[in-house]
């Protein structure tokens, strides 16, 4: 009986310790004026990112774990296209010279695995240019400088113009 209790106690402690482990890719909410993005922030860790870990020409969740979401508090022009206030799932299709940015109305997706099932809920597709930089960004970063959404990772930078109505 004592062995059974000891085994149960050790198993409980082990499971409890595992459940408190920190996520490998921490999550962050990037906040700008009237806009926020919730995303997992994976690290480069010496890997080739675009064209490697993240293949060209394939839908990508733009982060880690759950699909990235973007929330607009007011109606907006996103890369020159009108978008109603609300929360959307944010996907990209990266290519060497440009990215396709996708806003999708289906929330609660895990990664991009179900994208094909919900692509009929796409709100927007826009193409934006890619800029290669000398600056190495170790961890995927989304920020909101001066009327834009800036995506940086590895030596890649993508800027999406944002203008509120």
Short names for language-model regions:
Residues 1-22:
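Bacterial Sec-dependent N-terminal signal peptides
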Residues 6, 93, 154:
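Residue-level marker of positions within ordered structural domains that often coincide
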Residues 11, 43, 53, 63, ...:
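Preference for short coil/turn "hinge" residues that link or interrupt alpha-helices
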Residues 20-58, 108-165:
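Primarily secretory-pathway and cell-envelope proteins
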Residues 63-109:
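Mid-length scaffold segments of soluble, non-membrane domains
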């Amino acid at each position: 009986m004592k062995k059974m209790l000891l085994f149960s106690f050790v198993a409980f402690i082990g499971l409890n310790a595992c459940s408190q482990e920190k996520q490998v890719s921490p999550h962050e909410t990037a906040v700008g004026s009237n806009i926020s993005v919730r995303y997992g922030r994976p690290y480069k860790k010496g890997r080739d990112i675009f064209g490697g870990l993240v293949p060209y020409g394939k839908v990508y969740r733009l982060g880690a774990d759950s699909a990235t979401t973007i929330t607009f508090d007011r109606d907006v022009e996103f890369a020159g296209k009108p978008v109603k206030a609300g929360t959307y799932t944010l996907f990209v299709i990266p290519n060497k010279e440009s990215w396709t940015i996708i806003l999708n109305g289906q929330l609660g997706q895990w990664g991009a695995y179900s994208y094909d099932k919900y692509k009929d809920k796409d709100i927007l597709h826009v193409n934006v240019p890619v800029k290669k930089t000398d600056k190495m960004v170790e961890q995927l970063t989304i920020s909101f400088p001066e009327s834009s959404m800036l995506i940086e990772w590895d030596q890649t930078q993508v800027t999406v113009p944002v203008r509120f109505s």
